[in-house]
Amino acid sequence: MQSAIIVSQQVLVMFLMIGCGLFFNKRRLISESAAREFCSLLLNLALPCVIIQSFLRPMRPEYLSGFAMAIGIAFAMHLFAVAAAQLLIRPRADEGYRVERFSAVYSNCAFMAFPLLRATVGEDGVFYATAFVVFFILFQWVHGILVLGGSVNPRKLLYNPCILSVAIGLLIFFTQCPIPAPLTAAVGMLSAVNSPLSMVITGVFLAGLPLSGLRNIRLVTTAAIRLLVMPLAAIAVIRALGMPNWIETGPVVCTSLV
């Protein structure tokens, strides 16, 4: 019950920040073009700092085993999501089904999951959720691009800022090399920008969307798959495997987001 209250409060906070973005866009104080520039800042700086910060911890056996379990769960959940989208969203003459499949598989977990996890299970949740985000990025840049009809560029995938930040984080975690306090503080401050700025940007983009889309049965179906089918399947599988609560929370929260 306490976790539900904490999550509800955190979701309300996130909606308030989204509302700020919507308000500022309607008042012509933040344009969509400016929001796109902020997106670049998030993807190339703030989110990598969140990932690196999650690895700034002592190396313990329980962290290693937990991270390994989180990797296995993340891989299995993405495979299931891809298969479910292929099965539930059938090809049509128009190309819209490609976007629907992509939307059913890939959430906004890279930005929205971390504040929810930090509020419910602490920094450990963020650490284990990093495993999910790694596979999210890998699948998105390979399967996601193919679904949308594009071609995969291994070089772009390899030099993705989030992939590079995971490599840096793992290096720091396994070597336990000391990080200067000013650098640690800078990473922490930049990572703190991730959630509020991403919510404001979301509000800016929502301000330009027509409400008529809510009457589109295909969009509603895609949203139901994304927000109901995927999380419920994740909960069922993880509980059937008897995973600890802190392992369950991270992937389920990541899967449940829009």
Predicted regions mapped to residue ranges:
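Alpha-helical transmembrane segments of multi-pass small-molecule/ion transporters
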Residues: 1-258
